[in-house]
């Protein structure tokens, strides 16, 4: 009987510890910081998992969707990446980072014309230039140079 009480006590203790662990509220700020730390180390799979949780907790944050799309793109999940960039841009159509990264996705999937559309939108948003505009220009030019070299 004494052994049974000990086993029961241990079971209850560990059950409450496990429940407390899984019952803990997810802090979106903490998730975002964790994801960006993974991105800084180019740990795209880890960042992707964290950003999945983040976007569930903050579904109206265009930056979360943009980073989630970015990790999908880096993992070569182009359809998911495209869908997530679209979500980010639906929330904030003038999100320069989403426009740049979506343009890079278009380049990577051989849709230079669509990348040019994003470039033109960035030109409207940044009449005197901005980092996103310059980065997308470079990305498109680099791809066009690579195509020319392959043809020669």
Regions found by a protein language model. Give the residues of each.
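Alpha-helical segment of the N-proximal tetratricopeptide repeat
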Residues: 26-57
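Helix-start (N-cap) detector for alpha-helical repeat units in TPR-like alpha-solenoids
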Residues: 27-28, 62-63, 96-97, 129-130
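Canonical positions in the second alpha-helix
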Residues: 53-54, 87-88, 121-122
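Canonical tetratricopeptide repeat
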Residues: 67, 101, 135-139
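Structural marker of alpha-solenoid helical repeat scaffolds
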Residues: 57, 91, 125-128
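Register position in tetratricopeptide repeats
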Residues: 40-41, 74-75, 108-109, 125, ...
């Amino acid at each position: 009987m004494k052994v049974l009480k000990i086993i029961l006590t241990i079971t209850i203790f560990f059950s409450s510890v496990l429940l407390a662990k899984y019952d803990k509220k997810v802090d979106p700020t903490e998730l975002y910081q964790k994801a960006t730390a993974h991105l800084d180390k180019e740990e795209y799979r880890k960042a992707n998992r964290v950003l999945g949780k983040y976007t569930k907790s903050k579904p109206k944050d265009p930056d979360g969707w943009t980073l989630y799309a970015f990790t999908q793109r880096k993992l070569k999940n182009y359809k998911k990446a495209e869908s997530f960039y679209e979500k980010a841009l639906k929330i904030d159509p003038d999100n320069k980072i989403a426009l740049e990264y979506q343009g890079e996705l278009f380049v990577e999937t051989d849709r230079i014309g669509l990348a040019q559309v994003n470039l033109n939108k960035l030109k409207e948003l940044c009449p005197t230039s901005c980092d996103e505009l310059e980065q997308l220009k470079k990305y498109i030019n680099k791809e066009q140079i690579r195509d020319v070299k392959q043809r020669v």
